[in-house]
Amino acid sequence: MSKARFQLYYWPVPFRGCFVSYLFACRGVPFLEETRLEENKRLMDLNPDEQDVPYMGPPVLYDRETGRTLSQMPAIVLYLSPGLDLAPDDPFELAMCMKVLMDCNDVLMEVCRYNGSSMWDYEAWSEFRTRRLSRWMRIFEEGLARGFVGTDRLSFADIGVFALFGNMTRCLPELEADLLRHAPGIHALCRRVGAVPSLALYVADQEKAYGRLYCGGQIEQSIRKMLAQDEANGPR
């Protein structure tokens, strides 16, 4: 029987689950992953009073030592990070790391149009890519300049930034030029965090398993269609 303390439930794509899995990978801590679509869907579709923790969708973390279950990516990250030496001791610095992580979560929601509630049309996509996404990148770049991330002590905020932009530009390489233009320091930070050997190995294994799948489903098809249209239209 595995001695891993934690089991992570998430779809077979990186997207939001990698904000949790990258914590373990960065520290070389073994954990269990349940990525089967049918099992995640079965658990998600249970009535709230039948679930170990009432939730709408994964990621979900099961602590095999305590028997406790937790949902919501930011809550899971906050729970795990002190034990992995990835959380600051100072309360304000901890809150600032959470601010960065919640910003990451907001970007994910915008990219996938609120969990795929609607698909992209080109007018909306162009507005998002040229205005909102570029502003988000500048917000993160300013956070780096102010020391919210990128300090000598690695934090869950640093890993969150890598999970957001490192994964985004790996899976959707058309957006790397945007990141270099608007947030070159964040681009460099992603490279530095992604070079941690145990994390780099995990990401490589994920790519072998899933290719460059990003968020999956119809919404990923919609995003890729918009990027292809951008490419066909020439330089922005």
Residue ranges and their predicted role:
Residues 40-43, 50, 111, 189, ...:
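Generic structural signal of hydrophobic/aromatic residues within well-ordered alpha-helices
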Residues 52-57, 180-184, 222-227:
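Glycine-rich, flexible loop segments associated with nucleotide phosphate handling
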Residues 80, 92, 99-201, 234:
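GST-like fold's C-terminal all-alpha helical module
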Residues 46, 171, 176, 214-215:
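A generic membrane alpha-helix/interface feature
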Residues 207-236:
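C-terminal helix/juxtamembrane-tail motif
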Residues 195, 204, 216:
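Phosphate-coordinating loops and pocket residues in cytosolic domains that bind phosphorylated ligands
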